[in-house]
């Protein structure tokens, strides 16, 4: 064996592919055995595999060959499709928790079914994650027909599904769900007050379809469940008006990060406008934050790119796919800044009740895998963040698609005229054309150009998403012209109509290079599926966003030189490739930075959610309450240390505080603590409060005490966790500005977040102990009621007496 072949085998990617290929060969060897079995016998074989895995300590990898061969035969009997060897290879890669890169049209959907079945033998649940509800429901319907033949159940989870139906969906062996609804269900599960109200039974194994779209593109925006907060309508409007009046020399926008900032002139203008001497003073932090948000909304964001306005609502558009991110809104007041800019209703800024990033969420699974047609360029990120090796799977048939060199134009206007001319030329031959645009504005601009040229066409973007499947399905027919805002995650193959292959197949025309080569490859991948003929070409201008943001200096000179000419240039292609790699590195660093910060909160969230589950599941809370009591008593007594002698306590003040806050009248007096050291006082206080709580349990009865105490503990934890999230987000936002010491902002954030977390735990303990101590027992309640009634009678007698005196 040569050195090169040896290195290929020891490389994780090649080693995994080599193993998967070997498995596929073995599966092929079982073909005749399963072909000769009846449907009933196939079901019996499936049940035997379940028993081996669940009762006899076999792993799914031990039975993978038999299971894949069995499900391959079942698929054939149900659909008439016999899984290709490359689909078996892909299924094995998915099964072991890695990323199978399979080109468009290579049968990723069936590959997922094969892998899902094998993992479902564990009976612990498989979550198949898709990018939208249409795909989830479509794929769940098709999978049900196959998997029910081998005794497996299939569920589908989507928004607005009744709670009991969600539980039923997640109780199935395989559950199809959208990524956003799955994440929100996880957050909502950790807000329930009864464990039996949870929807998701376990985060065991997830297969993410269009994995790069979900795990990278959407990972930049965290999932957030919000609650209403105060409405600062006037403040948003005032700041919006101020920002709209700013002159060009009063603000600046970094061309690469697109981060806005005020110049010195802008700062002086702001201080004069808002009547303050120092915009950066601590008391002005909220004002400064609102100004930066308004700058982002007014000077950076564009309607049709970052968001659209529909029916008076600001809806976020996925930068990469052109889809609306349903149920998502910008956080920390940015959404309100955009609403003020667009002069629509400004909703109250919400308080974050629960939040998680996709990176943190999907890493909670015992095993995570993914499939996509475009992942290889982000191999490093998938390995470092998700511990998945990206393994390219060869196409079933050779790829004969022709990828033409880019045509480069000096300005966008010249480019668009050339695009229309090219579309007209191709359309006259009857060959179908798919045109990819970078954003909604460009798709509508091209729509207007084609209308003027009398070229019939369809437009697929966030404004027309309801007809997505219908439009994509027809895009390969003779004469079809389809404009699409990015094709990432569209999920429906473009099949060539009769006679189209003879014309050269689908012609894909990109009108702008994206920030990521991966997104460009997704568009190219729509042509030439399963060995079909196809052709792709990009028309780009030096005024496109990618050049303007990341190569602006060199481009200014090139535009002057190029003028109105056009040419296919290896120089520009190389510069473009370098620019894309640079942007990919910047975006990776941004996501990595998000993960570094989120990791701190993720570990705290894990601790809180685990503790919350313990509260919900416990049949005896006494140990947990005692730990809280210990934390509470030390902190409570610490407030009353004698300033002259830290080992002594001001026993009079301590006694009064305990009687006032914990209702310890008749139990505690200053004499109890006379001449006691601090440690002895803590021990005595702990004993007295513990005794009071024990007596409450006896009077209430243990079952009732369990219910009442649990509710107090859950409510206190939720209240202070929400408060903690708000504090952490404010800390994160300002930590860079506040970091004046010789240490990184991340280290400052880690240290101060830990302080906030410990403070939160103390607040939870304090609330729980005080509320339990003040919880009225039936006797105390009756006694208080008698006192209240006596006071009412006394008051009535006084009023009657006063009236009789007035009458005399």
From Swiss-Prot:
ATP binds at residues 87, 105-109, 493. Its main location: membrane. Its EC number is 7.4.2.8. Monomer and homodimer. Part of the essential Sec protein translocation apparatus which comprises SecA, SecYEG and auxiliary proteins SecDF. Other proteins may also be involved. Belongs to the SecA family. The keyword Translocase applies. It holds the Pfam family SecA_SW. It comes from Mycoplasma pneumoniae (strain ATCC 29342 / M129 / Subtype 1) (Mycoplasmoides pneumoniae). This is Protein translocase subunit SecA. GO terms for cellular component: cell envelope Sec protein transport complex; cytosol; plasma membrane. It catalyses: ATP + H2O + cellular proteinSide 1 = ADP + phosphate + cellular proteinSide 2. SUPFAM superfamilies: Helical scaffold and wing domains of SecA (SSF81886), P-loop containing nucleoside triphosphate hydrolases (SSF52540), Pre-protein crosslinking domain of SecA (SSF81767). GO terms for biological process: intracellular protein transmembrane transport; protein import; protein targeting; protein transport by the Sec complex. It is found in: Cell membrane; Cytoplasm. Part of the Sec protein translocase complex. Interacts with the SecYEG preprotein conducting channel. Has a central role in coupling the hydrolysis of ATP to the transfer of proteins into and across the cell membrane, serving as an ATP-driven molecular motor driving the stepwise translocation of polypeptide chains across the membrane. GO terms for molecular function: ATP binding; protein-exporting ATPase activity. Keywords: ATP-binding, Cell membrane, Cytoplasm, Membrane, Nucleotide-binding, Protein transport, Translocase, Translocation, Transport. Signal peptide: none annotated. It comes from the Bacteria. It is a peripheral membrane protein.
């Amino acid at each position: 064996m040569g050195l090169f072949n040896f290195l290929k085998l020891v490389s994780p990617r090649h080693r995994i592919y080599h193993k998967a290929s070997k498995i596929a060969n073995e599966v092929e060897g079982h073909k005749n055995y399963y072909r000769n079995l009846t449907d009933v016998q196939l079901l019996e074989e499936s049940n035997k595999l379940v028993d081996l895995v669940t009762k006899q300590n076999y792993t799914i990898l031990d039975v993978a060959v038999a299971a894949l061969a069995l499900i391959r035969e079942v698929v054939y009997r149900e659909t008439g499709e016999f899984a290709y060897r490359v689909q078996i290879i892909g299924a094995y890669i998915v099964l072991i928790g890695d990323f199978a890169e399979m080109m468009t049209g290579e049968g990723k959907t069936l590959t997922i079914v094969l892998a899902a079945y094998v993992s479902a033998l564990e009976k612990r649940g498989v979550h198949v994650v898709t990018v939208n509800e249409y795909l989830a429901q479509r794929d769940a319907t098709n999978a049900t027909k196959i998997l029910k033949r081998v005794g497996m159940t299939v569920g589908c989870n989507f928004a607005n599904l009744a709670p009991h139906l969600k539980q039923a969906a997640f109780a199935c062996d395989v559950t199809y769900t959208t990524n956003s609804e799955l994440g929100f269900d996880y957050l909502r599960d950790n807000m329930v007050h009864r464990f039996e109200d949870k929807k998701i039974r376990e985060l065991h194994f997830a297969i993410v379809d269009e994995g790069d779209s979900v795990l990278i593109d959407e990972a930049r925006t965290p999932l957030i469940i919000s609650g209403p907060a105060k409405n600062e309508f006037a403040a948003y409007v005032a700041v919006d008006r101020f920002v709209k009046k700013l002159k060009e020399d009063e603000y600046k926008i970094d061309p690469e990060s697109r981060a806005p900032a005020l110049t010195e002139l802008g700062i002086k203008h702001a201080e004069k406008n808002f009547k303050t001497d120092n915009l950066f003073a601590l008391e002005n932090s909220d004002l400064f934050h609102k100004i930066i948000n308004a700058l982002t909304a007014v000077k950076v964001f564009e309607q049709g790119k970052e968001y659209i306005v529909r029916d008076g609502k600001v809806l976020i558009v996925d930068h990469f796919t052109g889809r609306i991110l349903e149920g998502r809104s910008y956080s920390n007041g940015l959404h309100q800044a955009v609403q003020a800019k667009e002069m629509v209703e400004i909703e109250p800024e919400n308080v974050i009740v629960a939040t998680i990033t996709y990176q943190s969420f999907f890493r909670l699974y015992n095993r995570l895998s993914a499939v996509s047609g475009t992942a290889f360029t982000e191999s490093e990120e998938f390995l470092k963040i998700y511990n998945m090796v990206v393994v390219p799977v060869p196409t079933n048939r050779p790829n004969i698609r022709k990828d033409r060199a880019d045509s480069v134009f000096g300005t966008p206007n010249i480019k668009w005229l050339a695009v229309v001319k090219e579309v007209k030329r191709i359309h006259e031959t009857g060959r179908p054309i798919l045109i990819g645009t970078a954003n909604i504005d460009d798709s509508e601009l091209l729509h207007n150009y084609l209308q003027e040229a009398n070229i019939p066409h369809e437009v697929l973007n966030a404004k027309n998403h309801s007809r997505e499947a219908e439009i994509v399905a027809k895009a390969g027919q003779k004469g079809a012209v389809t404009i699409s805002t990015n094709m990432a995650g569209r999920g429906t193959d473009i099949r060539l109509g009769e006679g189209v292959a003879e014309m050269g197949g689908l012609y894909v025309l990109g009108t702008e290079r994206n920030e990521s080569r991966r997104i460009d490859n997704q568009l190219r991948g729509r042509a030439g599926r399963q060995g079909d003929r196809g052709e792709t070409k990009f028309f780009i201008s030096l005024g496109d966003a990618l050049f303007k943001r990341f190569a602006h200096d060199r481009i200014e000179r090139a535009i002057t030189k190029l003028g109105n000419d056009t040419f296919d240039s290896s120089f520009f292609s190389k510069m473009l490739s370098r620019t894309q790699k640079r942007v990919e590195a910047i975006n990776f660093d941004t996501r990595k930075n998000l993960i570094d910060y989120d990791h701190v909160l993720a570990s705290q969230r894990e601790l809180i959610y685990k503790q919350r589950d313990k509260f919900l599941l416990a049949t005896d809370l006494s140990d947990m309450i005692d730990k809280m009591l210990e934390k509470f008593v030390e902190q409570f007594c610490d407030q009353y240390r004698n300033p002259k002698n830290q080992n002594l306590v001001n026993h009079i003040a301590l006694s009064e505080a305990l009687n006032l806050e914990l209702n310890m009248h008749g139990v505690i007096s200053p004499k109890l603590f006379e001449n006691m050291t601090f440690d002895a006082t803590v021990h005595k206080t702990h004993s007295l409060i513990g005794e009071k709580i024990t007596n409450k349990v006896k009077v209430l009865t243990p079952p009732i005490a369990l219910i009442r105490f649990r509710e107090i503990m859950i409510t206190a934890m939720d209240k202070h966790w929400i408060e903690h999230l708000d504090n952490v987000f404010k800390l994160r936002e300002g930590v860079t500005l506040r970091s004046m010491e010789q240490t990184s902002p991340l280290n400052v954030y880690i240290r101060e977040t830990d302080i906030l977390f410990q403070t939160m735990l103390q607040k939870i303990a304090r609330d729980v102990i005080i509320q339990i101590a003040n919880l009225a027992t039936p006797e105390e309640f009756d006694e208080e009621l008698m006192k209240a009634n006596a006071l009412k009678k006394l008051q009535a007698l006084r009023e009657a007496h006063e009236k009789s005196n007035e009458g005399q």
